[in-house]
């Protein structure tokens, strides 16, 4: 049975049973705790928690899922995949354990001709949570399973959660016995290679808190209602129904393996275990990478981008180790498109962009391998020379940080060289780097990942946002928090702004979201203790429902239950709306100029400024930048009306509304329309009323922020005027200094630059001529140190390393065939101290090496150097040590 048929039968079965088919969500959701969607139930979490009312009591979906913690196990075992399709059925307060077991058993065991999968009931097993006697009874009653094919297991195996705070509950798993050829008897408890899990039925009834493992977390209490969340692995079922040993042999992954085998010198399944692992890595990772890129991620060095980059680079490395020298990424991505496109049409419609990003990463990493391999070879050689057998963590970190080498590549190359790697040292340096990168952001933002302190307020209901209609609102303080702990009162006592939060029942303040930073303003009130005032410095959402106002209490005290006035700074809001609407305008202009593949990858807008990231390979031309700026400002000048309305998500998409990749949208969405067809986006931010209110948009520049991602920055409104005024003043100053009209400044500057280049070239020629004359005198004055003729001189200032190399060659040629060493050092430009050492063949026969001597030469000038036996060079920063360097060199030669 082909995979597409397995998918169809699953959905048909549950639709007939009264379930609504729900499309797969993106693998990226706006949840800071979740790198990728890793379960079918993730998009339904608000329904399980009771935060939102589900539009249906029963639902079914086949969700794209990604799990990467076991990435190093992929290919080694045949059970691990980074991407999988999770087929699920969900009940929101409707049926519970009996219904879940009945529906699953019917689909699995019904004959194929009746729409089922036709599994032999005698080969199916079930596991349940330790004390779930009810589930055991139902398996015996509904399915007729004998007690010996039902096993009890603990928290680690049969109590399910996402691994983070959220819904959880005991589970019951269904296993298929593949037969004695796959291992010993004894059920799943004894052997999970023989007994393979195909379906997990989760009885979602509790909410969990923070924890450190599958077994160590707090149960916060019951959910508002009992729910069902099940997950059937499409790939595993396909493996069984297609009669193959593992998922890599199925109709979705085998085509990728065959594509690689067509160009690799060694085939798949030829008896080489390591090669088979590499084939599986390529098949698994290519599919995952294509899905991630399709959902809007580009390779990067953090978070999801880092995972994608690692996947792509593991593909490339595995292909290289199979002996494939030609580029393969384009063919692999096309194979995934052909195999999975019928189920995931975005792989077809967005193929050009997906392919472009993957191929660009392949090209970049091939360069990385070429340059980094030299550094690895040097480090390995130095390690062996020192008598050690362990490559340092520092070297491994440099390979990773500077050249992008994944640690597993370094490990493999080290093993081939007969070395191991200090992995602990590497991990320490990596941890320090990540800590440094995140320290500032962590200090500024409190992530609200632990909701236990806010639970009562979250359960009481959401904050009412009034900011679309007014900038000032009367409100009641629902809660006061200091350092995340609830307190009844807070007063002006020097508490830092980020430590105090006020939760209101209603607010006009926009909470940071969608790239728009939070409003600023004040909260004030008059209570029993007098007048109180607080400056609002930030506003963040808690559980997407509560607005937490981070404040600096400037006077008086605030008491829970007080009535207060929340007032947004109108100047701030005006600037924020200009920035946000300007972002939409620039986005529309980008797509008009570059085409539909210029997809948003992120944004930031604040009063007077916007930053827009988009997926694009290579820098924009000057003409493209000018066009984008012109299209944007033409739309501003057109004074388009900005219209907002709320509609159903599917209707908005049908209208062509742009949605941000990875964002999770509710069923009812807000649409922002600027100028009819010019710009139409899903957006919950604040905006101007017409485009002319944005004011001029001035693009400051365009740059790269990662592989395949570009960034445009711009000023809007008054800040744009100020920027233009500065540029005008700068041009006027240049014109005055050059004594030409403004319009002649570019030509005048170009002329001056050419004259300067000519003068510098002539100066270099004269300096080198003088140096060559000095070289003749240097040969005549060569000293004898032991058996070696030595020319060691301090040259006149301004000499470059290239100049010194040229002179060294002249001098060495004039010293003849007897043992000779030439060492020149100079005071170069920008406080640099370049130096070069040359050793002729006769001196090398005496044991002298330029790459050894240059180290003695470098130390006194605080420099570094390296090279080969005949020629080495370097540079330092301490001109005061030049004489000492010359003396050290003489002494070293004298000891030889």
Curated annotation (Swiss-Prot):
InterPro entries reported in the protein's UniProt record:
aa-tRNA-synth_II/BPL/LPL, Ala-tRNA-lgiase_IIc, Ala-tRNA-ligase_IIc_anticod-bd, Ala-tRNA-synth_IIc_core, Ala-tRNA-synth_IIc_N, Ala-tRNA_ligase, Ala_tRNA_ligase_euk/bac, DHHA1_dom
Q: Which reaction(s) does its UniProt entry say it catalyses?
A: tRNA(Ala) + L-alanine + ATP = L-alanyl-tRNA(Ala) + AMP + diphosphate
Cofactors, names only: Zn(2+)
Q: Name one Pfam family in it.
A: DHHA1
Q: What is its EC number?
A: 6.1.1.7
Give binding positions for Zn(2+): 580, 584, 683, 687
* Family to which this protein belongs: Belongs to the class-II aminoacyl-tRNA synthetase family.
Among NCBIfam families, the record links this protein to: alaS (TIGR00344)
Name used for this protein in its record: Alanine--tRNA ligase
**Gene source species:** Mycolicibacterium smegmatis (strain ATCC 700084 / mc(2)155)
The gene coding this protein: alaS
């Amino acid at each position: 049975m082909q995979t597409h048929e397995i998918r169809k039968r699953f959905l048909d079965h549950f639709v007939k049973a009264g379930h609504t088919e729900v499309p797969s969500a993106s693998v990226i959701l706006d949840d800071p705790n979740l790198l990728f969607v890793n379960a079918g139930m993730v998009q339904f979490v608000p329904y399980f928690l009771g935060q939102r009312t589900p539009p249906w009591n029963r639902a079914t979906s086949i969700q794209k899922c990604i799990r990467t913690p076991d990435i190093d196990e992929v290919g080694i075992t045949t059970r691990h995949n980074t991407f999988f399709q999770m087929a699920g059925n969900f009940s929101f307060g409707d049926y519970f354990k009996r219904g879940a077991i009945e529906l699953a058993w019917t689909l699995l065991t019904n004959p194929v001709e009746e729409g089922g999968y036709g599994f032999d009931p005698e080969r199916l097993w079930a596991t349940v949570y330790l004390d779930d006697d009810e589930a055991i009874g139902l398996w015996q009653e509904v399915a007729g399973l004998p007690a010996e094919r039902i096993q009890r297991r603990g928290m680690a195996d049969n109590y399910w959660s996402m691994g983070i705070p959220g819904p959880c509950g005991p589970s019951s798993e269904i296993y298929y016995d593949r037969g004695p050829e796959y291992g010993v008897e004894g059920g799943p408890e004894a052997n999970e290679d023989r007994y393979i899990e195909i379906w997990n039925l989760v009885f979602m009834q509790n909410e969990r808190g923070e924890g450190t493992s599958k077994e160590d977390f707090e149960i916060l209490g019951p959910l508002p209602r009992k729910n069902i969340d099940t997950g059937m692995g499409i790939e595993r079922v396909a493996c069984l129904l297609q009669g193959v040993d593992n998922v890599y042999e199925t109709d979705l992954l085998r085509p990728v393996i065959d594509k690689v085998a067509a160009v690799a010198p060694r085939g798949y399944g030829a008896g080489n275990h390591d090669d088979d692992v590499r084939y599986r890595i390529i098949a698994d990772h290519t599919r995952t990478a294509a899905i991630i890129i399709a959902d809007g991620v580009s390779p990067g060095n953090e978070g999801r981008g880092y995972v994608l980059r690692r996947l792509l680079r593991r593909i490339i490395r595995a292909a290289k180790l199979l002996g494939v020298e030609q580029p393969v990424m384009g063919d692999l991505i096309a194979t995934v498109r052909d195999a999975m496109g019928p189920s995931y049409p975005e792989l077809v419609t967005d193929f050009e962009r997906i392919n472009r990003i993957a191929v660009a990463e392949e090209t970049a990493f091939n360069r990385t391998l070429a340059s980094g391999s030299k550094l690895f070879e040097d480090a390995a050689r130095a390690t062996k020379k020192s008598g050690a057998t362990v490559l340092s963590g520092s070297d491994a970190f440099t390979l990773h940080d500077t050249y992008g080498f994944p640690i597993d590549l370094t490990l493999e190359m080290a093993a081939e060289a007969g070395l191991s790697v200090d992995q602990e040292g590497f991990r320490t340096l990596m941890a320090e780097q990540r800590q440094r990168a995140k320290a500032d952001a962590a200090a500024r933002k409190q992530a609200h990942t632990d909701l236990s302190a806010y639970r009562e307020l979250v359960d009481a209901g959401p904050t009412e946002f009034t900011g679309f209609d007014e900038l000032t609102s009367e409100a009641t303080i629902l809660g006061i928090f200091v350092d995340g702990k609830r307190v009844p009162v807070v007063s002006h006592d020097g508490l830092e702004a980020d430590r105090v939060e006020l939760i209101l029942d209603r607010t006009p303040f926009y909470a940071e979201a969608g790239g728009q930073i939070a409003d600023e303003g004040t909260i004030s009130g008059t209570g029993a203790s007098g007048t109180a005032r607080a400056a609002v410095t930030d506003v963040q959402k808690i559980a997407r429902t509560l607005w937490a106002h981070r404040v600096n209490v400037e006077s008086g005290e605030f008491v829970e239950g007080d009535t207060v006035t929340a007032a947004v700074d109108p100047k701030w809001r005006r600037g924020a709306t200009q920035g946000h609407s300007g972002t939409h305008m620039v986005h529309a202009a980008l797509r008009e100029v570059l085409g539909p593949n210029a997809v948003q990858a992120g944004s930031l807008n604040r009063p007077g400024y916007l930053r827009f990231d988009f997926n694009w390979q290579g820098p924009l031309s000057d003409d493209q930048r000018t066009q984008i700026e012109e299209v944007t400002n033409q739309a501003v000048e057109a004074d388009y009306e900005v219209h907002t309305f709320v509609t159903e998500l599917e209707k908005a998409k049908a209208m062509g509304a742009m949605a941000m990749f990875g964002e999770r949208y509710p069923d009812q969405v807000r649409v922002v329309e600027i100028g009819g067809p010019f710009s139409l986006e899903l957006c919950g931010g604040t905006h101007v009323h017409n485009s002319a209110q944005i004011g001029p948009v001035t693009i400051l520049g365009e740059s790269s922020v990662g592989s395949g991602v570009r960034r445009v920055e711009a000023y809007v409104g008054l800040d744009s005027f100020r920027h233009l005024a500065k540029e005008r003043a700068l041009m006027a100053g240049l014109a005055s200094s050059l004594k030409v009209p403004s319009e002649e400044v570019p030509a005048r500057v170009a002329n001056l630059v050419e004259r300067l280049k000519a003068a510098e070239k002539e100066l270099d020629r004269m300096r080198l001529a003088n140096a060559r004359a000095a070289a003749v005198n240097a040969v005549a004055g060569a000293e004898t140190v032991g058996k070696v003729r030595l020319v060691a001189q301090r040259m006149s200032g301004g000499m470059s390393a290239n100049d010194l190399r040229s002179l060294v060659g002249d001098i060495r040629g004039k010293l003849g065939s007897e043992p000779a060493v030439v060492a020149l050092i100079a005071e170069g430009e920008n406080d640099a101290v370049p130096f070069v050492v040359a050793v002729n063949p006769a001196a090398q026969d005496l044991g002298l090496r330029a790459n050894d001597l240059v180290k003695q030469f470098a130390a006194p000038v605080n420099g570094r150097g390296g090279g080969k036996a005949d020629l080495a060079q370097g540079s330092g920063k301490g001109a005061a040590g030049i004489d000492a360097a010359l003396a050290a060199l003489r002494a070293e030669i004298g000891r030889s």
